[in-house]
Amino acid sequence: MSENLNILLAQTNPIVGNIDHNRDLVLDIVSKNKDADLIIFSELVLSGYPPEDLVLKSAFQNKVCDAFHEIMDASVESESYIIIGRPWKENEQLYNAAIVLHKGKVFHRHLKNTLPNYGVFDEKRIFAAGNESSLFEIKGNKIALFICEEIWDSETYKKVEGKDCDLVVTINASPFEYKKISQRENLAIELSKKINAPVIYVNQVGGQDEIVFDGSSFVADANKVLRRLPACESTSDLVTFNKTKKEFSFSEKVFDEKSEEEILYSNLVLGLKDYIEKNNFPGVVIGISGGIDSAFSACVAVDALGSDKVKGIMMPSKYTSNASVEDATLLGKNLNIEMISLSIEEAALAYESTLKNVFEGTEQDITEENIQSRIRGMLLMAYSNKFGYMVMTNGNKSEVSVGYSTLYGDMCGGFSVIKDLYKVDV
């Protein structure tokens, strides 16, 4: 028996609810990687993550089961062991599970012990918690299997301490946060020290509504990260583990290292791209004011979708400076996007005329300013309704956190790519 174990890290972009797509992702990777002894997919790759209330529907559960059995049938022709994340029903309870397939059979199953219930997570509402540690053996290699949150919980991973593991595998759907990648890596290094085995961390990649999964899968030992997969890319990597030496060897494939700022920008691009494409919008339309927020949003949109799928609309009034118009026009030219100019002057006068008797005897104030903002929102939404393009809003986190916006005005839209960036970050 060979001492080497060939392991494929499959960093994929599943779509929540599109089980056929997710099944095909898995089948395609399995069919193209026959040299792998072990293929590792991410948490709940079959359903997509987070599945939320979809996973409570029996029709959805049945569809997942059907897709799983298709993969199981296909695995008969493969020598690989395949780790798949999926919802799993057992004794009338629904679990977040990692299933190991081999030769058309369930070789091993692990039910997630630690269920996160904070921030974007609400797994305790949906899933029951498992309570067993998870160890299985492949070609003489004893492997400890974890699912995401479990490696952040010392009570869970203590269950396998002292059990002579050769390797730790954790499958994940861990959302991106600024500088979180280094937190995960440091956690894995500490876990490797405690269990005395190297760690393989496979994470989901892709946008799902307001969440972005950065991927950034890696291999680490007790001293350092040995191999990193790129952030924000669907990719895979074949690594070889030698049990006797407890060492890895890697292919000559080169992955570009990115700075923290580049990774942050890449996640903005990925989040917008997947939101538009997974929801089948033809493109986006943005109100371009000549300011930095709308300019940055437009840059992200072009990088995410291409200039042909981004429309810019300028909506000047009598208060709009020439400099703002010139800046907006230059932006459109530099990004090679179609720019449309719609004056709001006549619409503003119409509102002024309609409200003249009601407002008689009052001074102009923020009310009139907000009317202008709402006219712009109406024009953007009219374009969206007519042509199907989704309106992007341009509110940053500094503005949103203090309510600095106009209801039914600059808040109109379906997605703000900078909603989680403070003004200073923009």
Question: Would you name each region that the model predicts?
Answer:
Residues K112-P116, F121-N131, K139-G140, G162, ...:
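Active-site adenylate/phosphate-handling loop in enzymes that bind or generate adenylated species
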Residues F281-S294, A347-A348, N396-S398:
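A glycine-rich phosphate-binding loop feature that marks nucleotide/adenosyl-phosphate handling sites
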Residues Y275-P282, V302-K311, T320, L330-I340, ...:
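Secondary-structure transition/capping motifs at alpha-helix termini
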Residues E233-T240, K309-M314, N322-T367, S373:
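A conserved beta-strand->alpha-helix junction
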